[in-house]
Amino acid sequence: MEKSWFNLILSKGELEYRCGLSKSMDSRLGPVENTTVNEDPTRNDTDKNIHDCSDSSSYYSKVDHLVDVKDIRNFISDDTFLIRDSNQDRYSIYFDSENQIFELNNDHSFLSELESFFYSYHNSSYMNNGSKNDEPHYHFNLYDNDTNCGWNNHINSCIDSYLRSQICIDSSILSGSDNSNDNYISNYICGEGGNSSEGKNFDIITRENGNDLTLKESSNDLDLYKDLWVQCECENCYGVNYKKSLNSKMNICEQCGYHLKMRSSDRIELSIDPGTWGPMDEDMISLDPIEFQSEEELYKDRIDFYQRKTGLTEAIQTGTGQLNGIPIAIGVMDFQFMGGSMGSVVGEKITRLIEYATNNFLPLILVCASGGARMQEGSLSLMQMAKISSALYDYQSNKKLFYVSILTSPTTGGVTASFGMLGDIIIAEPNAYIAFAGKRVIEQTLNKTIPEGSQAAEYLFHKGLFDPIVPRNPLKGVLSELVQLHGFFPLNQNSIK
């Protein structure tokens, strides 16, 4: 005997009842049985008097004597939703919240009998005696089809709301209080149960047979797909790109050609010859020099979080490599590490890289991607601007060596005001956001509206702020030509590509 379950919920006073509906293999509607285990002889006698659903008068006459709302906690371990999708196909979904198992049933003959049963009940004399009109919260929809949400969203919402009810049940319901007119289970089934708790969603993974489904909880829908898909950041696109193919295409959107943010490791791989990367000062980590006070979390805890998230020790990677066989010193900032903010360690690593390039007569390339100086280190982070600029003065003016700065999106604040704009050649990526102060800060300070696009690379290029705008595809070749133009050549002439 296969069983399918449904909730019969009547929001009249304190009446709540769950019954089970047995379905035989020949799709005939069997007797209605009470699933409650109760030793009350009066109630057991009542249950024995319930006959087949075809004997509707006998069944309906006994409904209002079945179960009090105080026993509701005994009935909410499983549930079934009757759903109709956008194609008008009907489904019954049963789930056991303890085992987190779902069963999907689209047996049309059985569902037709269920539908007939509920509609006949809805039109019965019991319902027409004023109960529906007197109870403002009564609402039962056999097939709840929310036009504002998709099929999956509605199922997720119902499941989410139901599981929330397993954790936190209104105390007035548990205590049998008279203030129980707002039938929370009825609201949940009818799609009125409110928002999901803490933004959590539930995903249904279907087995091959299409009947059994398993519930899986995740903190966010995006978490399920972030390792597979990347959304374009362009406000005119927002296209979705497959992550594996995106890496091979240099993080350039397939739909609109927008240059997405890149991890520092990916950019290093893009910029230099394979197998030539030699990192420097990897063991340098940030402390808390000013014991920064924060209501949210400690500065050290934030550093630890981003170290685990990115696998980096700081917001920049510095080292040496070869550019088509030409030895270079290169530093690449990573915006994923605290917004690429420049603190004491970032400033020290850049300064040491410049000094190494000065002593070894190497061309220098710095890739900027930063929100500016790190506020958690106060004036110590601002001091890095002067320290780096001083080292660059010796490198450029005294040693007459060649420095290229590459501005990617975003480059703002103290980085823009220091080494970002000190390159002998300043290269910008297409559509890069380049500014000293952000748009919102300027508007709040000057009480003026900033035109759209006034801080984009293309607009600033026409104002003479930097030299070329170079896409990522030819960037390595352009850098190689610039370096050779300034007198730096490959160690092995055969390595020129």
UniProtKB/Swiss-Prot annotation:
Main localization (coarse): plastid
Location of region: Disordered: 30-50
Domain of life: Eukaryota
Gene Ontology terms describing biological process: fatty acid biosynthetic process; malonyl-CoA biosynthetic process
Pfam families documented for this protein: Carboxyl_trans
Bias kind Basic and acidic residues: ranges: 40-50
C4-type Zn finger ranges: 232-256
Annotated compartments: Plastid, Chloroplast stroma
Cofactor descriptive note: Binds 1 zinc ion per subunit.
Catalyzed chemical reaction(s): N(6)-carboxybiotinyl-L-lysyl-[protein] + acetyl-CoA = N(6)-biotinyl-L-lysyl-[protein] + malonyl-CoA
EC number: 2.1.3.15
Cofactor annotation: Zn(2+)
Pathway, per record: Lipid metabolism; malonyl-CoA biosynthesis; malonyl-CoA from acetyl-CoA: step 1/1
Family: Belongs to the AccD/PCCB family.
Subunit structure, as described in the record: Acetyl-CoA carboxylase is a heterohexamer composed of biotin carboxyl carrier protein, biotin carboxylase and 2 subunits each of ACCase subunit alpha and ACCase plastid-coded subunit beta (accD).
Name of this chain's protein: Acetyl-coenzyme A carboxylase carboxyl transferase subunit beta, chloroplastic
Gene: accD
